[in-house]
Amino acid sequence: GIIEHIFKIVPNTMHFVEIGFGYYEFNSMNLIKKGWSGKLIDVDNDEVIALKKNLNHYYKNIKVEVINTKILKKNINELITEKIQTNWIDFFSLDIDSNDYWVLETLDLSKVRVLCCEYNHWLGSERKLTIKYNEDFKFKDNGVWGASLLALTELLKNKNFSLIAVESSGTNAFFVNNKYKDKFEVLSPSKSFRSVGRFYSADKKKEIYKNIKQSKLFIEV
């Protein structure tokens, strides 16, 4: 997989932080299987309880903290840096389907080696769009959520990260700290853009694009 390939190249201390997960599927699962330690954070208490049970059953001796909390601009840096026993976060994953752009903008990423974040594929490849910051935002699969790949790439470029991979499924993008960028091909967000839209019916896609066009929740950044 992409993560495994990246960490064959990027040095690491086997430490991760992942924000936003499903108990049955998340980006750090294979890292945990390999003995990595870290934090898993999600706002959904049911997901947190289910994941704790799964991890305790299958991986009894792991050093993974599962935290139930809402991610906000005012608490993100404290959550990420608190009690971390290493100077670096080797793998940081963000997928909250809402204020992702604003969380990344606020977060100190200087000690992150590799970053993965979900982008809103419905927003296309050419516009720098994100939803306005809204602590009460609730995700709906209507196209109105998160940020475009171009917006995230430009934001992270200003934080010394480069785009090096995009999942073929059109879900996640991977960025590397510029300390390691010479080891990879740096990608263009417009040329590497992928979309999940092919899995939706024509009527559903038409509805989603209409929602996006009419929404007052997006802003250009």
What is each model feature region?
Residues 11, 87, 110:
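Structured loop/turn residues at beta-strand edges in well-structured enzyme cores
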Residues 66, 102-138:
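A short alpha/beta connector and helix-capping loop motif
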